[in-house]
Amino acid sequence: TGEKPFTCNECGKFFSCTSWLNVHLRSHTGEKPFTCSECGKFFSCMSRLKVHFRGHTGEKPSACTECEKCFSSISQRNIHIRSHTGDKSYTCTVCGKIFTRISQFNVHVRSHTGEKPFKCTECGKSFICNSQLNLHLRFHTGEKLTTCSECGKCFTHTSHLNVHFRVHTGEKPFTCTECGKCLTRQYQLTEHSYLHKGEKPYTCTECGKCFTRRYHLTEHSYLHTGEKPFTCTECGKGFTRRSHLKAHSHTH
């Protein structure tokens, strides 16, 4: 019927059954309960683990009916089929990630360029997509605030609270397989991995300079815009970098 009666309380996305909703919720919490017995990699759902495990076994059960080429997953086969049908797919030239929808592709590209076209009219903060802006607006409206029991800090959704709470517990569930460093968030692990690979996927659209971390690109962009968002509460002096503000604060 196409009915999707189950709603994610974090982002409002709809699902046809509770099992898919539960898998989706892990994208907010960062939970990855399924572990590969061969390499130790973690996954949010069993189906992704099964596809990954075929990389170890060499199993490729999904065959193209046009040329009989085999793939480890149906999604890989479907992407390949477009080469026969002429259907469009959108590939990121920076990291190679493939998208079937232009809207998803455009949002992803902004993660590399640092472009944030959706601006909050209340405080001026910008975001790469409208859904992030809508979540942020809850800070101003006070909608559905959840509070940390340790320090009283408020959050718009529980996934942010769960990540914040690791500051108090010291939990760092994401481990680098190269050097063993532990991190509190998945995106921190992803950006840390670029240091080992030598990759710099975040590029300034003004001058072409590349960075391994998104916030380095954001701070760099202030040099072009002249913006100084980090302000000293003592004297009002503004800075383009948080580290410069911290160094300045010692003078007071």
From Swiss-Prot:
Zn fingers (C2H2-type): where? 6-28, 34-56, 62-84, 90-112, 118-140, 146-168, 174-196, 202-224, 230-252
Q: Name one GO cellular component term.
A: nucleus
* GO MF term list: DNA-binding transcription activator activity, RNA polymerase II-specific; RNA polymerase II cis-regulatory region sequence-specific DNA binding; zinc ion binding
Location of this chain's protein in the cell: Nucleus
Asked whether the UniProt record includes Transcription regulation among its keywords, one would answer yes
Q: Name one GO biological process term.
A: regulation of transcription by RNA polymerase II
**Major location, coarse class?**
nucleus
Q: Which Gene3D superfamilies match?
A: Classic Zinc Finger
**The keyword Ion transport appears for this protein:** no
Q: What InterPro entries has UniProt attached to this entry? A: Znf_C2H2-type, Znf_C2H2_sf, Znf_C2H2_type
Keyword tags: DNA-binding, Metal-binding, Nucleus, Repeat, Transcription, Transcription regulation, Zinc, Zinc-finger
- Pfam families membership: zf-C2H2
Job of this protein: May be involved in transcriptional regulation.
Give the protein family: Belongs to the krueppel C2H2-type zinc-finger protein family.
Task: Return the protein name.
Answer: Gastrula zinc finger protein XlCGF28.1
Which organism was this protein described from?
Xenopus laevis
